[in-house]
Amino acid sequence: MGLPELLFMSQLVAPDEVPRWIPGQLTLDSVPVGWDQVTLKGYQYTSLDVEIPSMRDYMLVRYKCDDAVMSRRAGGAWRSERVGRGVCSLLTRGESSQWKWDRPIDVTHIYLAHTELCRVAEEVFERSVSDVGMEDCVRAQDDILPGLMSAFESELESGGLGGGLYRSSLVNQLCVHLLRR
């Protein structure tokens, strides 16, 4: 990795730094159990209007609350969607944006490492992949993603025999699913 890439990476926000920009009550955290390539965090938030800096990882949000209006902009007009239980939002890495919502929300965040998504993309496309783009989406129309995110959450809360292998399988499923989108 060259100097420009190292400087860019040093300016990106890691999952543990998110509360500096989006203050909320932490309800779940995979960091103490040492998950690799993916971090799961749960939060309860009041209604907020926040600037989200450039993230190091891809960020997926699953809503576990009653309906709220979620709005996003990145240098342009606001885009608003109704979100609620079972709905997901997608945020790419390396781009800042502004988000706001009109009422308290309960969410699960999954942060997926760029290196992991690129690794899986290399296997899928059978060639070297240095970057994968993902378009921000306030309301992802996706029947699979909420279930995958729920499986990660269940694994964190309950665990069990073969936990590392199971989690690795979930990471692979998540990466392939995102690449198909």
Q: Would you name each region that the model predicts?
A:
Residues 127-173, 177-181:
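Amphipathic alpha-helical segments enriched in hydrophobic/aromatic residues interleaved with Lys/Arg
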Residues 2-22:
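OB/S1-fold single-stranded nucleic-acid-binding modules
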Residues 20, 26-130, 159-160, 164:
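N-terminal regulatory/effector-sensing and dimerization cores
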Residues 17, 116, 144-147:
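Exposed alpha-helical structural elements
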Residues 2-4, 28, 174:
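Hydrophobic alpha-helical transmembrane segments
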